[in-house]
Amino acid sequence: MSEQLGSHITTPSSHDDASKDKRPAAEVVNGSGIFIMADLHTGKPITLKCGLTLPNRLVKAATAESMAPNNTLPDEKFQNLYRHWAEGGWGMVLAGNVQVDANHICTATDLSVDHSLSDSKIVEAWRPWAAACNGNGTVTVMQLCHPGRQSPAGAGKRGLFAKSIAPSAVALQMGSGLVAKAVTALLFGTPREMSVSDIETVVSQFARSARLAAESGFAGVEVHAGHGFLLEQFLSTKSNRRTDAYGGTPAKRARIVVEVLTAIRAVVPAGFCVGLSLNSVDLQSQTELKDCVEQVKLITDAGVDFIEVSGGTFENPTMFLGPEKSRKQAQLGQPLAHEPFFLDFAKAIRPHVPGVPLIVTGGFRSCQGIEETIAGGDADLVGLARPAVVNPLLPKTTVLSPKTTEFGPEIEDGDVTLYAKKTEAPWILKQIGIRAVEVHIDNSVYHNRRHAAKQVRRASVLLQFPSRPSLSVAAVDIDNVISRLSTARPFVFIFLAITVEVNIDTDIAALLLALRPSPELYHLAAAMPPRRSDGSADHDVPDWPKTPHPTPYDILAMRKDDPYTKHRFFQLVKIYHPDRHGHTPAVHRLPHATRLERYRLIVAANDLLSNPSKRSLYDTQGVGWTGDRPPTLNESVRHAEKSWRHQPGNASRNATWEDWERWYDARDGKTRDPMYMSNGVFATLVVMMCMIGAFAQMSRAEQSGTEYLETRDQSNLAIGQQISRTTLVSAGRSKDERVDSFLRERENVAYEFTPSKYDDRTRTEA
C-alpha cells in the first residue's frame, strides 16, 4: 500500500534523510528545488538578456481566466489559482490576458487596467496577486494585451454601441456561411480606424500597465502581439491597409510595436523583463515570411528579452485547434499528431534573432517532444497551457521528475504523455461555420478546472474517504479546511498532487505514515460532525415536538407569554423547506409526506403567532390553528407516501438509456449481451435505407408531377372558355343578342363559370 501511494509523491519535503541517500548519483537539485536528472536539457537554467535567470525551460503559458469581478481587478480567486502554479516548479509563469484598456476587452470578465482608477488603487489589488504568483521564488511575467477589433460589443466600458478600434476598418470574418456572417456582424461589427492620437493613447496605456506591474512585484511583462490582437492586426497586411506612418511597408506596420517596447523600457527599472508574443506566419508564402523576418529584426533591436511563438486568431483559432494538417493527422490516429504546432516557424526565424531566447507554445503533449525540442536547439523554452491547467504541478511531478525513484521502477520518457482532453463540438454546432464556437466547447473543461482551483488556497496531498466523509486531510495554513471531500465533483481535485480513496477499515495513521507528509505542512483533521451546506452541524437540528398533535407554541418552542421571534422559525425552514430536502441526514430519513406536513405546520405556526390579533384570538378562543384538521381527499392523494419511487433498484429512477441497461442487468442477474454488427451488414442497412429514401422521393416526385399537369389542363380550359365568351361579346351583334349574351354571362358568373349551352353550341359549330 505504501509503495503504491508513495510512487505519486515527488515533493522534496516528502523525502526524509534516508531517502536522500538513495537518490541516484546523476540526480541534482535545480533552482526550483526539484530533483532532476543532470543530463536533462529541459531542467537546465537559462539567463535572459535582462539578467533574469530561469531555473528550467518550462513556461506556464498565458491563459484567459475569465473570472475577474466587476472592477476588473484581481481578487482572492486569482491568488488561489496562481498559488497552485507557483508551487509547480515552473521556470516562468505567464500571468495572462491583462487588457491595457478597460474600454476594450475580450470578455466581460477579463482583467484590465481601468484608467479612471489611480495607480495606488491598481497596485493595491495587483500586489497580493503578484505575491501569490512569486511564491517559492517563481518568476512571473504579466501578459499585456489589447484586443482591437476582437473586442465584442458590450464587453468593455466603452458602451454597447461604441465601435471597437483597429488599424483599418476591416471587419472580422469568422466564417463564410450566412449564419457566421450574421453573428460576426452582430457581435463585433466593423471597427473604427484608429487615428494617430488613438495610437499614441494605446502606446501610453501599455507603458502605464507595465510600470504598474513592476511596482506591484512582477518580474516582467509580455507584450501580446499575436492571436489576432491589436498589435498583430498592425503587423498583418490582412487587417492593416493604412498608407500613413503606420502602414504600407513591413517596417511601418511594425512601428507601433517598436514604440510600445520603447515606451515600456522608458518607465520600468533596469533588469525588468520585457518579452513579446508573436504569431507565426504561413511558411509557404515567402512574402509573408520575408516581411515577418524584417519586423522581428526591428522588434529585437527595440529590446526584447524573449520572443514567444504561437499562432491563430479569432478567425482561425489554430492556437486552440491546431493547424489543419495536425487536425487531419489526429483524426487519422497518426503518432505525434499534436506535437508542436509552430516549431517550423520558430526554426525559420531562429537565425535572424541571435541571442534572443525563443519560447514555442502550442501542441506539446509528450516529455520526449519537449526534451528533443530543447536539446536540438529549435527553441530555448517550451510553453504549456492546457497541460498546465490540468496539472499545475506538472514540472515537479512529471516533466522534470527523475526517471528512477525509490518508490517505483524506471519510466521511459517516451511513455510519458501530457494529458490534454480534446472536446469536439456537436455536429449541429459545427454546421454554423464559426470556428470560435468549437473553441468555446473545447475550452469549457479547462475553464471549469481553473474555476475549481480558485476555491482551494493550498494543498499538495488530498485524501478522500468515501465511507467516512467526516474525516479530511488539509494543509495547516489553509483558512477554510477542506472537508467532506467525497461529496465534491472529481475534477476539482485534479489540481492537487494526489487523490487516494481508502476503505473505512484502513488505518489512517499508517496511511499518513506511508505517505510521509511533511509535519509542518499537513495534519489530520479531527473527526468532525457532518456539516450541512449552511455551515451548522447535525446536532444543531431542533427537535420536533413528541406530541402527535403539536400546538404552534410546541412547534416554535415558545411559552404563551414569550415575545415572538423568528429565530426558531428560520431554523426549521432551513431544515424542512422542500428545496432543501436531503441537506440534513437526520431529516432526510423522514418520509416525504411527513416532511411536507411538518413544513406546512411550521408556516402555519409562524403565520399565527407573528400576528398579534390572530395570536390573541387563538389564546382566548382556540381558533385559527389548522394543525388538527383532517386532510382533504386531494391532499391525501397529493401527500401520499411516494418514497418507494426513490428506493434503489426502482425503475422510476431510470432517466437515461444507461440507467435502463444497469436496471435490466441487476434484475436479470447478469450483463445483457451486446449485439454486434459486421461491417457488411451495416453497409447493407445503409444501402437499403438509401434505396428506400430514393424510392420514396421518386414516388413523391411522380405524384407532384401528375397533380401539376392536371392543374395546368384545368387552367388552360378555363382560360379558353373565357376568351371565347369575350370574343363573342365583342363581335357585331344586334341589341337583342347582346342582351341575351349579358343574361347568360350573369348566369355563368353565378354558377362559377359553368359552360352554358350557348358556349357548347358555339364550340361545336366552330
UniProtKB/Swiss-Prot annotation:
Keywords, sorted A to Z: Flavoprotein, FMN, Glycoprotein, Membrane, NADP, Oxidoreductase, Transmembrane, Transmembrane helix
One GO MF term attached to the UniProt entry: oxidoreductase activity
Keyword rRNA processing belongs to the record: no
Residues with attached carbohydrate: N30, N70, N136, N634, N650, N654
Residues binding FMN, per UniProt: A61, A62, T63, A64, Q143, A385, R386
Residues covered by the J domain: 551-622
Main localisation: membrane
First-tier enzyme category under EC: oxidoreductase
Segments of this protein annotated with the region Disordered: 1-24
Start-end of Polar residues biased regions: 1-13
Location within or outside the cell: Membrane
Bilayer topology: Single-pass membrane protein
Name of one Pfam family that matches: Oxidored_FMN
One term under GO cellular component: membrane
Function summary: NADH-dependent flavin oxidoreductase; part of the gene cluster that mediates the biosynthesis of ilicicolin H, a 4-hydroxy-2-pyridonealkaloid that has potent and broad antifungal activities by inhibiting the mitochondrial respiration chain. The biosynthesis of ilicicolin H starts with formation of the tetramic acid by the hybrid PKS-NRPS synthetase iliA with the partnering trans-enoyl reductase iliB since iliA lacks a designated enoylreductase (ER) domain. The cytochrome P450 monooxygenase iliC then catalyzes the ring expansion of the tetramate to the acyclic 2-pyridone.
PANTHER family, A to Z: BINDING OXIDOREDUCTASE, PUTATIVE (AFU_ORTHOLOGUE AFUA_2G08260)-RELATED
Protein's recorded name: NADH-dependent flavin oxidoreductase iliE
Native organism taxonomy: Eukaryota, Fungi, Dikarya, Ascomycota, Pezizomycotina
